[in-house]
């Protein structure tokens, strides 16, 4: 029987998932004046149904990563609808309206919270929490990283730094790629094997992909925004640099190079 704290966390997870679905669907519905767009909230239904099925029996807990995959696919589709196209909805955002830029930023920031609630309320098992806690924090930081890059696009409409549209589209593409990569760490736990060499190779490959495709790319984009357009991003530049260094240490430890001991 789950503790009351876990039950509260599960209730919050379900509530925030529904709230985010409604809020994101409201942007195309309001700005395109078409109520049928509210049906986009159904993009989160597979994640909700799968989560309910897993919560019904703790034996299904190893499949929790599939909930995140279903969620992140729906989340990326929402982002492409709002930020993509020749005339994106984010260009039409009105600060005077409830569903304006500030509400959109807060709605996007729910993604890391939803991730932490999903992983931390799966079970009362301390063994499970010890295994998942470090991974969930790292994933949440990368999600915040991606959301902050989307905020650069939103804020460009409020205070222009002269960032060209093609560069904004490049930011959007890399953000979506980083979100799609986010389930890799959870999949890695699911695919753990007794063969130490295979496990280390897979973990090293995943870490290298995340360093290159997420933090290195975002670091490059932020430095370009800073040097080319005067966009201050010093905090997240430092974050990307720190994560890259930690990731390189992890890869060295896994591969036993540079005098590092493997684990």
Predicted regions, residues:
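Residue-level signal for alpha-helical transmembrane segments in multi-pass membrane proteins
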Residues: 19, 23, 50-53, 77-80, ...
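Short, intrinsically disordered/low-complexity patches at protein termini
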Residues: 242-243, 258
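Multipass alpha-helical transmembrane domains of eukaryotic endomembrane proteins
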Residues: 122-229, 248-263
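Membrane-embedded alpha-helical bundle segments of multi-pass proteins
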Residues: 43, 48, 63-168
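Chromatin/DNA-recognition segments of nuclear transcriptional regulators
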Residues: 231-240, 247-250
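N-terminal signal-anchor/initial transmembrane insertion module
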Residues: 1-107, 227, 254, 259
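Physicochemical signature of membrane-embedded alpha-helices that form the seven-helix bundle of GPCRs
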Residues: 5-15, 36-42, 66-73, 97-108, ...
């Amino acid at each position: 029987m789950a503790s009351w704290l876990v039950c509260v966390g599960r209730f919050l997870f379900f509530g925030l998932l529904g709230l985010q679905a409604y809020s994101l669907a409201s942007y195309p519905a309001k700005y395109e004046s078409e109520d049928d767009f509210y049906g986009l909230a159904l993009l989160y239904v597979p994640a909700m149904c799968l989560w309910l099925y897993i919560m019904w029996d703790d034996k299904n807990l190893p499949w929790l990563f599939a909930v995140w995959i279903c969620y992140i696919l729906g989340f990326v589709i929402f982002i492409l609808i709002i930020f993509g196209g020749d005339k994106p909805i984010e260009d039409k955002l009105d600060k005077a309206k409830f569903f304006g830029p500030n509400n959109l930023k807060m709605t996007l920031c729910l993604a890391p919270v939803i991730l932490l609630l999903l992983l931390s309320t799966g079970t009362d098992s301390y063994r499970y929490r010890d295994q998942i806690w470090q991974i969930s924090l790292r994933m949440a930081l990368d999600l915040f990283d991606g959301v902050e890059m989307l905020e650069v696009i939103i804020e460009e409409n409020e205070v222009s730094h002269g960032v060209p549209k093609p560069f904004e589209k490049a930011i959007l593409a890399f953000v979506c790629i980083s979100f799609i990569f986010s389930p890799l760490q959870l999949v890695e736990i699911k695919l753990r094997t007794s063969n130490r060499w295979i496990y280390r190779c897979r973990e090293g490959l995943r870490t290298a992909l995340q360093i290159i495709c997420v933090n290195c790319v975002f670091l490059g984009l932020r430095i370009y925004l800073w040097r080319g357009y005067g966009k201050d991003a010093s905090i997240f530049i430092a974050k990307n640099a720190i994560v890259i260094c930690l990731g390189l240490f992890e890869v060295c430890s896994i591969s036993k190079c540079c005098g590092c001991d493997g684990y």
